[in-house]
From Swiss-Prot:
SMART domains with a match to the protein in the record: NAT_PEP
Name of one Pfam family that matches: ANP
Disulfide bonds: 194-210
Taxonomic source organism: Craspedocephalus gramineus
Signal peptide residues on this chain, from the entry's feature table: 1-23
Family: In the N-terminal section; belongs to the bradykinin-potentiating peptide family. In the C-terminal section; belongs to the natriuretic peptide family.
Modified residues (Pyrrolidone carboxylic acid): 27
Positions with biased composition (Basic and acidic residues): 142-152
Ranges where the record places region Disordered: 25-181
UniProt-recorded name of the protein: Bradykinin-potentiating and C-type natriuretic peptides
Amino acid sequence: MFVSRLAASGLLLLALLALSLDGKPVQEKPGRSPPISPLLVPPPPPPPHWPPPHHIPPLSVQKFPPGWKPTHPHHIPPLEVQQWSQGGPRSELVQPHESPAGGTTAFREELSLGPEAASGPAAPQRLPKRKGASATSAASRSMRDLRADGKQARQKWGRMVQPDHHAAPGGGGGGGGGARRLKGLAKKAVGKGCFGLPLDRIGSMSGMGC
């Protein structure tokens, strides 16, 4: 009730104020207002002075007179076409589906022999079977000698690395004086230490990493 009365009185005061201001003329301020200068628009800049473009001559097609020839012509040899004789014998040529004289076996033998199968004075002379057998036996004998030397070198290396292992008496089946083969638990124990990689068949172990 009290609030409504306050609101009504406020609205009445606002209405009276509007009526009092409506009848009064607009009061001008004393003094003159400063003059407003006109808007100045700058003139446009002059166009840029570009240099004249280079003279490009028109495209002309080179024309030669009817009977003109170059002073230094390049020599081009004429094209040679390989001509085959019409109806000539072709018995010396081997077709892909044919085999040479002697059958497929002879052809395979020539391929396997390589340059030895060539005929003529440039072909190497074939050795007789006896000489070939002797050469093969000599080659196999030299390979056995090299294999034995390698085995002896490995045995010497094993003695140098593990002198205690090779100092015990008793043969090991080709150990060369004192080498013995480790068996059972002793062999497993040695295999766990120093990498334990066997070097040959007599049971010698490598001493790398000790």
